[in-house]
Amino acid sequence: MFSDAIRAVILGIVEGVTEFLPVSSTGHLLLAERFFDLGSGNFWNTFTVLIQLGAILAIVVIYFEKLWRIALGMFSNDADRRFVIGVLAAFLPAVVVGLIAGKYIKELLFNPWVVCFSLIVGGAVLMWVDQLDHKPHEHDATAFPLPMYIWIGIAQCLAMIPGVSRSGATIVSAMLLGADKRAAAEFSFFLAIPTMIGAFAYDFYKNRADMTTDHLGIVAIGFVVSFVTAIVVVKAFLSYVTRNGFTFFAWWRVIVGTLGLIALALGR
């Protein structure tokens, strides 16, 4: 239906748009592959992991000054050191659960039905949290208390279920724990860096035999498209949610999940 280059562009756009929005990039990629013949098989499964690095690079570029300052100061500045420890503490639960249960989660839950139900349920939760009488007391993503970082990391484990959304789980948990909307979103971005690099390294090592030099051009296309798209989306997303909240994204999830269920019921 599509050439490999067009598939790479479309999947790169889907990844760049959805990775940092609370709508589940994995869920959208699985549905795109299912309904639009955008590639399946070991190479394309690995491809969707590889292009996440483009989205991660976008976060590094956007927050480079802050991340560089923290990297330089983590051995001499208590606040920077606490933040690095907090990110690592939030990252650790996903490592443990992924190593123990990741294989079984992929075998049992990586299907379009689970994605659609997760999108709908997650949308309802996001809408509920967004409409709470929220009185935030944490306004700096780099200065949350350590227990808060740990709880956010535990919540992130729910995102191993396709359709839940890593950013959605971390943003919702951060807001319930007292973060304002912008701080919740920003910490979700920061936590994505080690989480997604770890997922990439693990999946790439397992599936390295499926990659050849013939694939480099296709991967490069997806990587660049994902990077450029993510830069635009992240900047717009922060501005939007600070003013308007997350209701739009909650409805997005519900609508996509419902349309997906209808398509599946009709035999697509």
Swiss-Prot record:
One of its GO terms (biological process) is regulation of cell shape. Pfam families: BacA. The chain crosses the membrane at residues 43-63, 83-103, 109-129, 144-164, 184-204, 218-238, 246-266. It is a multi-pass membrane protein. One of its GO terms (cellular component) is plasma membrane. The keyword Cell wall biogenesis/degradation applies. It catalyses: di-trans,octa-cis-undecaprenyl diphosphate + H2O = di-trans,octa-cis-undecaprenyl phosphate + phosphate + H(+). Keywords: Antibiotic resistance, Cell inner membrane, Cell membrane, Cell shape, Cell wall biogenesis/degradation, Hydrolase, Membrane, Peptidoglycan synthesis, Transmembrane, Transmembrane helix. InterPro entries: UppP (IPR003824). It is found in: Cell inner membrane. Its EC number is 3.6.1.27. It comes from the Bacteria. GO terms for molecular function: undecaprenyl-diphosphatase activity. Catalyzes the dephosphorylation of undecaprenyl diphosphate (UPP). Confers resistance to bacitracin. Belongs to the UppP family. Bacitracin is thought to be involved in the inhibition of peptidoglycan synthesis by sequestering undecaprenyl diphosphate, thereby reducing the pool of lipid carrier available. This is Undecaprenyl-diphosphatase. It comes from Nitrobacter hamburgensis (strain DSM 10229 / NCIMB 13809 / X14). The gene is uppP.
